[in-house]
Every structure is written in C-alpha cells, then in structure tokens.
From Swiss-Prot:
Keyword rRNA-binding on entry: yes
GO molecular-function terms, A-Z: rRNA binding; structural constituent of ribosome; tRNA binding
A GO CC term attached to the entry: ribosome
Calcium is among the record's keywords: no
Protein known as: Large ribosomal subunit protein uL5
Complex formation: Part of the 50S ribosomal subunit; part of the 5S rRNA/L5/L18/L25 subcomplex. Contacts the 5S rRNA and the P site tRNA. Forms a bridge to the 30S subunit in the 70S ribosome.
Membership in a protein family: Belongs to the universal ribosomal protein uL5 family.
Protein function: This is one of the proteins that bind and probably mediate the attachment of the 5S RNA into the large ribosomal subunit, where it forms part of the central protuberance. In the 70S ribosome it contacts protein S13 of the 30S subunit (bridge B1b), connecting the 2 subunits; this bridge is implicated in subunit movement. Contacts the P site tRNA; the 5S rRNA and some of its associated proteins might help stabilize positioning of ribosome-bound tRNAs.
Keywords for the protein's UniProt record, in alphabetical order: Ribonucleoprotein, Ribosomal protein, RNA-binding, rRNA-binding, tRNA-binding
Biological-process GO terms, alphabetical: translation
Cross-referenced InterPro entries: Ribosomal_uL5, Ribosomal_uL5_bac-type, Ribosomal_uL5_C, Ribosomal_uL5_CS, Ribosomal_uL5_dom_sf, Ribosomal_uL5_N
Disulfides per UniProt: none
SUPFAM superfamilies (UniProt xref): RL5-like
Length: 179
C-alpha cells in the first residue's frame, strides 16, 4: 500500500465522515479512476509524432496508453474516420494512487508561477478536470529527449455525489486549490 492510499484510509476517511456526517465508511467518496488524455492534432500529418506522445504518456503513467481515434471524418480538419489522433490511459487502484501522489507532491509544484489549480473545474457530478500545458513537469520526462512540448488533460472520477464533497476529498489528498 502506498503513501497516499494509507493517508486516505487513516486521515481522509475519518475527516470526511466528521465533516459530512456519514454514518458508514462506504458512504465516504473515493477516487474511482484517473484518466489522462493527450490529444495530438499534428498526428494527422505525421504519425511519428503520435509515437513520441505515446511513449511520453507511458513513462508518466507507468501503463501502456490506448490510441484514441477520430469518430467521424471532418474535411475542414483534414481528418478521416478511425485516424489515430491521440492517446489516453485509465489508471485505477495502486497505479492511480501512485500517479495522484506524484502529481500533487512533485509535478504541480514544478509548474512555473503556480498559484494552485482552479477550484471551478468540477462537472456537477463530483468529477474534476485538470489541464496541464507541458509534460516536462513530470520528473520522469528528460528535457533533452522531448521533441515538442505537449499538454494533457487529467480527469479525476470520484464517487462523490456533489462537487463540494469531491473538492474536500481532493483537498484532503493534497490537491493545491487556488484561493
């Protein structure tokens, strides 16, 4: 069991039960999965670009990404149906906790001019979305081997019923929300 998972069970669960008045431990919200998506628009012209994005994402997540493909052909964007345009990874259980721990304690503090993540990016159902502009904030990525700076979307899917519960859960887990 890693550091964040232990902290969730020993500190977060009792604190959430007290704050929201849950009667049962199973009512306490938890992170169900974390989805990391990297859209690579240039992949339509140069498929090699997608390979480097896949390798970057694999290094960051510690799990092999799956390619995301275009659902429909769009002439204005010069894309055809089933053309590979990005990659994504769904992390659960141990990998998920390791990634969230790494993101909160190492990667986010390395962002330039970092003042906290937006507290408004909840979807109304207790899920949180976070956009990152460059993959270089992760310690596993070597600056010299990066061909192009790419961003990614990170989605935290929680079992919380409201945004307030999800915000408190992520705050207890160390997510630095902007004031």
């Amino acid at each position: 069991m890693n550091r964040l998972q232990e902290r969730y069970e020993k500190e977060v669960v009792p604190a959430m039960m007290e704050k929201f008045g849950y009667k049962n431990i199973m009512q306490v919200p938890k992170i169900e999965k974390v989805v990391i998506n990297m859209g690579v628009g240039e992949a339509k012209d140069n498929p090699k670009v997608l390979e480097s994005a896949v390798s970057d994402l694999q290094i960051i997540a510690g799990q092999k990404p799956v390619l995301t493909r275009a659902k429909k052909s769009v002439a204005n964007f010069k894309i055809r149906e089933n053309m590979a345009l990005g990659c994504k990874v769904t992390l659960r259980k141990t990998n998920m906790y390791e990634f969230v721990d790494k993101l909160v304690s190492i990667a986010l503090p390395r962002v330039r001019d970092f003042r906290g993540v937006s507290a408004k990016a909840f979807d109304g159902r207790g899920n949180y979305s976070l956009g990152i502009k460059e993959q270089l904030i992760f310690p596993e990525i070597e600056y010299d081997k990066v061909d192009k700076v790419r961003g990614m979307d990170i989605i935290f899917v929680t079992s919380a019923n409201t945004d307030e519960e999800a915000r408190e859960l992520l705050r207890f887990l160390g997510m630095p929300f902007a004031q």
